[in-house]
Regions:
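Membrane-embedded alpha-helical bundles of multi-pass transporters/translocases
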Residues: 1-237
Length: 237
């Protein structure tokens, strides 16, 4: 969710605000990502102690969906204001952080469930699954973002701009030349293409989060009460 939004955000800022201003705007949006994640980590223990995790997940899903709805309307229904955009980003990143932490706790609780069933702990297996899922998610995010860019017709323009940045890094092109060329590339992008990009960067996270939430609701049975019973049974052995 959050990482995918950051990946999409780079191209979003290129074509919505122009290449010249995109650098600072991407930086600010990334700061919102870090701030939202840190605040969610700081407040998770307090919030989770006052409600069930499934209730917390439900609230997070609703808030994230609302955030993406606002992002979809940004510049169309809502004013094209940078402060508003960063506030929307903070809301999405904060609740996504809470959601991720709740899922991590739920995954860790399966260690005791596994111990109850099989008589031994498999901490290393759970750790390996988490590590693999992070790497897999990173690869999927890159693939999905590339697919959305291709379908919207922006992929070639995005690659051309990235190529300019590489040339500047090599010293074969000045920043002024890169800026001029990048603006020329960005000017080729039509409003319908940026709309398709916006739809992709909103629809993909919403659909994946909805699917994950439905899967958890149907398949995950270790509630707080069940977990306490599991721990009690293990301790009594």
């Amino acid at each position: 969710g959050s990482n995918l939004l950051i990946i999409f955000g780079v191209n979003f800022f290129y074509f919505e605000f122009g290449y010249a201003d995109s650098g600072n705007l991407i930086f600010l949006f990334t700061v919102m990502y870090g701030l939202g994640t840190l605040v969610s980590q700081a407040l998770y223990a307090f919030i989770s102690s006052r409600m069930h995790r499934m209730t917390l997940l439900k609230i997070c899903i609703a808030a994230i969906f609302a955030g993406y709805a606002l992002l979809m309307g940004f510049g169309y229904v809502l004013p094209k204001n940078v402060v508003l955009l960063n506030c929307i980003g903070f809301v999405i990143f904060f609740f996504q952080g809470l959601y991720n932490l709740a899922v991590i706790v739920m995954l860790n609780n399966t260690i005791e469930y596994d111990e109850l069933r099989f008589g031994e702990r498999h901490d290393s297996v759970i750790s390996a699954i988490r590590s693999f899922s992070v790497k897999l998610a990173g690869a999927v995010n890159q693939g999905v973002s590339a697919l959305v860019l291709i379908l919207s017709g922006i992929y070639t323009v995005s690659q051309n701009i990235s190529g300019l940045e590489i040339e500047v890094g090599k010293g074969t092109m000045t920043s002024a030349q890169a800026l001029e060329n990048a603006n020329a590339f960005a000017a080729q992008v039509q409003p319908r293409q940026t709309l398709l990009l916006r739809i992709g960067m909103v629809a993909v996270p919403i659909l994946t989060l909805a699917a994950a939430y439905i899967l958890i609701r149907k398949k995950y049975k270790i509630t707080e009460e069940v977990y306490q019973k599991i721990v009690t049974e293990i301790t009594a052995r």
